[in-house]
């Protein structure tokens, strides 16, 4: 049964690459803690011809939100964060332009009012934590925090992550907190919030197909400068998902 499943998955990968426009694919599945599917195909880097293998690391969008929220829950469990206190209690600079009453709960539930990326953001600036959180703190909210939802497709990590960093008695960088408090205790070896130099050669490079432009519309607010990323939200002004 396992062998037939592996064959089915590999066939699907081959079709995705050969007929559906995928460049590189990797699939792993576990059953009762045992790795039963471990298939891959295609390229991890079109420019060099490097192939995908079992050690290739893929950027997986939004999975880090779960780790970020878990990090905050750890702080709450330790009594370092109260979900119903304002974010500005822990991060005073955030409490500007009407964001002072937005709570940690609002941040966790995408109701804090800052769903868009900073204007002028670049891939390099996205890697500058202090720049990102400084720019987010200076933002005017798109709506009064707590009154509606605006999905934080990208800003969630910096908003919630900065609360974690500010409440960490050791003030560790957020990526270090994730490694030391979540990944290492659980034996997770290949999940990163910020890629170390020695790991970077294993990371697959994302590419947009030129014949498949993003279907999303709206104000990209700086994300257009980031290769492979799009920040629209249906037809809603400013790319906000009004859930």
Locations of the language-model features?
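Short, surface-exposed loop or secondary-structure junction motifs
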Residues: 45, 97-243
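Positions in alpha-helical segments
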Residues: 11, 70, 89, 158-162
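Short, conserved catalytic-motif segment at the N-terminal edge
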Residues: 2-60, 82-85
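Non-cleavable N-terminal signal-anchor transmembrane helices
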Residues: 30, 34, 41, 59, ...
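Hydrophobic (often cysteine-bearing) scaffold residues that line and stabilize catalytic clefts
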Residues: 5, 9, 60, 64, ...
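Short, well-structured active-site flanking segments
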Residues: 36, 67, 73-92, 167-195
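Short secondary-structure junction motifs
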Residues: 22-24, 78, 82-84, 136, ...
């Amino acid at each position: 049964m396992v062998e037939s499943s592996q064959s089915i998955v590999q066939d699907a990968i081959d079709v995705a690459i050969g007929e559906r426009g995928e460049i590189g694919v990797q699939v792993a599945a576990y059953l009762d803690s045992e790795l039963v599917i471990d298939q891959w195909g295609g390229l991890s880097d079109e420019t060099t011809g490097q192939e995908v293998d079992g050690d290739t690391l893929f950027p997986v969008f939004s999975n880090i939100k779960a780790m970020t929220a878990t990090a905050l829950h750890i702080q709450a469990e330790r009594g370092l964060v109260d979900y119903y206190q304002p974010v500005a209690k822990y991060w005073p600079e955030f409490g500007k332009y009407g964001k002072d009453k937005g709570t940690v709960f609002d941040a966790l539930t995408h109701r804090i009012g800052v769903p868009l990326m900073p204007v002028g953001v670049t891939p390099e600036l996205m890697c500058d934590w202090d720049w990102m959180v400084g720019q987010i703190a200076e933002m005017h909210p798109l709506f009064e925090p707590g009154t509606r939802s605006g999905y934080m497709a990208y800003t969630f990590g910096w908003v919630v992550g900065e609360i974690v960093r500010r409440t960490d008695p050791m003030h560790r960088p957020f990526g270090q907190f994730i490694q030391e408090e979540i990944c290492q205790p659980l034996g997770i070896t290949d999940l990163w919030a910020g890629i170390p130099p020695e790991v970077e050669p294993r990371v697959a490079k994302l590419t947009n197909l030129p014949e498949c432009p993003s279907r999303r519309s709206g104000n990209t607010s700086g994300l257009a400068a980031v290769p492979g990323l799009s920040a629209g939200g249906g037809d809603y002004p400013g790319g906000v998902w009004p859930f």
